[in-house]
Amino acid sequence: MDAPWGAGERWLHGAAVDRSGVSLGPPPTPQVNQGTLGPQVAPVAAGEVVKTAGGVCKFSGQRLSWWQAQESCEQQFGHLALQPPDGVLASRLRDPVWVGQREAPLRRPPQRRARTTAVLVFDERTADRAARLRSPLPELAALTACTHVQWDCASPDPAALFSVAAPALPNALQLRAFAEPGGVVRAALVVRGQHAPFLAAFRADGRWHHVCATWEQRGGRWALFSDGRRRAGARGLGAGHPVPSGGILVLGQDQDSLGGGFSVRHALSGNLTDFHLWARALSPAQLHRARACAPPSEGLLFRWDPGALDVTPSLLPTVWVRLLCPVPSEECPTWNPGPRSEGSELCLEPQPFLCCYRTEPYRRLQDAQSWPGQDVISRVNALANDIVLLPDPLSEVHGALSPAEASSFLGLLEHVLAMEMAPLGPAALLAVVRFLKRVVALGAGDPELLLTGPWEQLSQGVVSVASLVLEEQVADTWLSLREVIGGPMALVASVQRLAPLLSTSMTSERPRMRIQHRHAGLSGVTVIHSWFTSRVFQHTLEGPDLEPQAPASSEEANRVQRFLSTQVGSAIISSEVWDVTGEVNVAMTFHLQHRAQSPLFPPHPPSPYTGGAWATTGCSVAALYLDSTACFCNHSTSFAILLQIYEVQRGPEEESLLRTLSFVGCGVSFCALTTTFLLFLVAGVPKSERTTVHKNLTFSLASAEGFLMTSEWAKANEVACVAVTVAMHFLFLVAFSWMLVEGLLLWRKVVAVSMHPGPGMRLYHATGWGVPVGIVAVTLAMLPHDYVAPGHCWLNVHTNAIWAFVGPVLFVLTANTCILARVVMITVSSARRRARMLSPQPCLQQQIWTQIWATVKPVLVLLPVLGLTWLAGILVHLSPAWAYAAVGLNSIQGLYIFLVYAACNEEVRSALQRMAEKKVAEVLRALGVWGGAAKEHSLPFSVLPLFLPPKPSTPRHPLKAPA
């Protein structure tokens, strides 16, 4: 082995060889310390390899971040330890070590970006240093201000980071701060002259910090954020009044008058840059985007631009600095040998780690230097006059690789591989794959390279070399290494990581970039184990349609598995969508065909180490059929998005939980509404305006929820998805229209108390069914191509299509809320008068109880038919709690209607009682015991009531469960 393995590696090649064939040799003699702490085992040495229950693990002497440690292990064809160390290894560790995850290859390091920006340098406190925005500000009912600041810790007096003075209000808005020596910087927000307390914002360490302040007129809610975390917040600051219009924004100074009145005492001492101002209060997620160099554009009043400022001459010339865009403070799993427990640390903190292997692949990697293909490695290294391809795949890489060197080495490697006539040997393939992984890993290293690195040239070189090692003549070599590398897709995944790095080279003048080597020569492709529900992938192939096939035996299945590890089923191997904040998940539904099982040849699950494995992150089983399984990834339609007016990105666990709750609640509501509608039809409830309204409401709402439950399966077909969206749009609008009719009818019966006949059911039917037809037709005519949202079957929130539903719903909910409030007032007044008539001097407790019940009762009775449970759906973009509330409230609406307007409704119960009496009478008549025949059989009429349910004895109240 090479020297870089270190002293701890040398004992690996001792005399002993274990039964698995891995040379372990005699371990180092434990060094015993006879101190006060008792005997202690010697710590594991750098480069030492120790046998574990699941294979072998090699201890690296380096301390790296979680992502760098994972990358280092992958370059050596291993992986981070997937479980806590056991046995002797656990007792020999001294520091916490990183622990991997079974889906770790799918995790990527955050792409730190660097950018150059102008900085205002306030190197000393003077009264003549300030930067003023030329244009006045509008009236602000809410605002957010963010900036990067480097505070001068030697100045203890309070200073203004920025201030806004209005014509009649000098202290309209300020953010003030001061530093405690050796402690923290405390900041306070001032709004309309009201001063919040000084609270700790960030450490007084002289470094750059990102500071944000938010404020809302309603309730005077304010919050202070620094470095992505909420530090303070409260209510009551300048509540009820906006920041007046005509305000002047000044950076670095307090204003005692409009645009002036500067003082040395309140002048900023430090550096300030990247100031942004919004006319709304940003959410924590949006503040994270602003901190990550991607400020939201909605409501943005001022984007950092020194050219838009009047800068005093003493601040000129401006200084340019390079800032690193922050990354999330994500935590990664660790194992602590002290308490022998699992924990977590910040992923960017350097920690030691273990690279682990299964026993057989590790034994093969040990023998790699004796494999064929060493001549290619020697030739490339000789031409480069450097170690480009490492003969030993288990050796650690020492020394940094610059982008220029990588580009030059890629050119040499491409030339040698193109001139090679014989198929590439296993040793050379391992070395080439490792070098490509090393080149791709450059993007996760120094953030400065993200702007300066020649990523387009490097990407072209990587794609060219990768194409050469994916040639058909190398298929046998890939098969021989399938347990070591995991198949060609491991190389494809590495190449794909270059795509986000290329975004630094794309501009508005060059919005597209294509890097290609040559066509892979796909023809006659056969897709194994799958079929396509959409023909979008088939269009990428210039050949006949794809025919799904399935293996007939276990032997054929194993052959197919080997085939899958070297063949592709589409010209599109993989695809991703990125924006400025990272990868964007795209919804996808696919079907897996079942394989017929034979009792003589039981199927063996494919090994992930032999290629052809499925990635399951964010995916779940959508449906099970007799011959197939439908799988879904990342997005679906639920109650939470019907009234959602902004796009909300949710995690796969949260999305799956919402989808499950929606489906279960929707099913319960659908069954309850269907039962209610059938009871209205079958029971023979007396006809009335209220009964007609409730029939139409339950029918339309049940139909809409039925289509909502089927929307999951409709996504696979574009036409079906559009049809389901149109049906849901129409039926939900019909349901809300009948909710409005219910409110108008309630107003006429309870509030107006008109003795004149109403407008008639024709007008009600025109409102309930005609208006929704018009709205849906107009929406389809105006937005034929932007009607359906991408990813699920519902209206598009990125266009005005969503307002064709949200607008009418808001109108109905507003009108019904006003009607309900008026009904409650009348009910409370009537209850108060009734209580006084029954008891001239009622006690205080009885009065309070009477008024509370008079308020709660109509709300409980009328809430479901007026649709007020849908109000939570408008707020789902604010917090996940509102999404769950919307799903819960809307799911129980149908059950609530059934309980109040069917199960507990006296008219329905009376109708059912009449039906029962009629059925019993028919049975008795059929038995010949009715009328005169009753005497012959000695069955008196007094027996008949025993077969019937008791009649209600309490009088009907007008607000008690009307039909």
Curated annotation (Swiss-Prot):
Q: Which UniProt keywords apply?
A: Disulfide bond, G-protein coupled receptor, Glycoprotein, Membrane, Receptor, Transducer, Transmembrane, Transmembrane helix
Q: Among the entry's GO cellular component annotations, what is one?
A: membrane
Which regions span the lipid bilayer?
Answer: 663-683, 692-712, 721-741, 763-783, 801-821, 858-878, 881-901
**Entry-linked Gene3D superfamilies:** 2.60.120.200, 2.60.220.50, Rhodopsin 7-helix transmembrane proteins (1.20.1070.10)
Which segments constitute the Pentraxin (PTX) domain?
A: 116-325
Family that this chain belongs to: Belongs to the G-protein coupled receptor 2 family. Adhesion G-protein coupled receptor (ADGR) subfamily.
By what name is this protein known? Answer: Adhesion G protein-coupled receptor D2
